Regions:
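Short, solvent-exposed coil/turn elements at secondary-structure transition points
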Residues: 22, 28, 82, 95, ...
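FAD-site-proximal beta/loop scaffold in flavoenzymes
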Residues: 42-120
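Glycine-rich beta-alpha junction loops
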Residues: 49-54, 94-95, 130-138, 162-165
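Conserved beta-strand termini and adjacent loop/short-helix elements that scaffold enzyme active sites
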Residues: 19, 73, 159-161
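Structured beta-strand/loop patches that form or line metal/cofactor-binding pockets in enzymes
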Residues: 26, 140-169
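Short phosphate-binding/catalytic loops that engage adenosine nucleotides
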Residues: 14, 68, 154
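General small-molecule cofactor/ligand-binding pocket signal
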Residues: 15-17, 90, 157-159
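Rossmann-like dinucleotide-binding cores of NAD(P)H-dependent redox enzymes
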Residues: 1-34, 38-39, 98-106, 114-148
């Protein structure tokens, strides 16, 4: 999927740099953005997009004092019922670094409520999550990645489809 999007964007004149760190950007008198990347290359562009990813925002929550375990990214580690290393503390959403999507966090919260307040243990299902990326071309996925499906199920069939808008047919 990434390769298809990369190819489509490249065909539209978008240059994509991977494994490069942005050292700085400034707007020149000519109105262009002048950027320097970690390999020393200087770039002139009308626009610069920097995709840096996201990290859980847990730094000032007092997790260490509470004895709540975190991983190397400082995400709160949880079991299948969103329980942390402290049996009376639960965590859901982006701070757990499971799936960083609002509908998933809401689902995790609903499972937490069912588990804790209704005494009906329910674990969130992260296997059938639909996603959409609003690029051109648009990207949508549902279910496990191929790698995760092979790991979980062994031999799998993979189906891919590319669609054109009806107006283009």
């Amino acid at each position: 999927i990434r390769e298809s999007l990369h190819k489509a964007m490249t065909q539209k004149g978008i240059r994509i740099l991977t494994e490069a760190m942005l050292e700085g950007v400034r707007r020149g008198d000519d109105g262009l953005l002048h950027a320097v990347v970690s390999n020393g290359e200087a770039l002139d562009a009308d626009q610069v997009m920097l995709a840096v990813g996201r990290l859980p925002n847990t730094e000032h929550l007092g997790l260490e004092r509470a004895g709540v375990a975190t991983d190397k990214l400082r995400a709160i580690t949880v079991d299948e019922f969103s329980r942390t290393s402290q049996p009376n503390i639960f965590a859901v959403g982006d701070v757990t670094n499971r799936v960083q999507l609002t509908p998933v966090a809401i689902h995790e919260a609903m499972c937490f409520l069912e588990t804790v307040f209704k005494d009906n243990p329910v674990s969130p299902d992260h296997d059938m999550i639909a996603t959409g990326v609003f690029t051109r071309p648009e990207i949508g996925t549902v279910g496990l990645s191929e790698e995760a499906a092979v790991k979980k199920l062994g031999d799998v069939d993979v189906f891919r489809a590319e669609f054109r808008p009806m107006k283009a047919t």
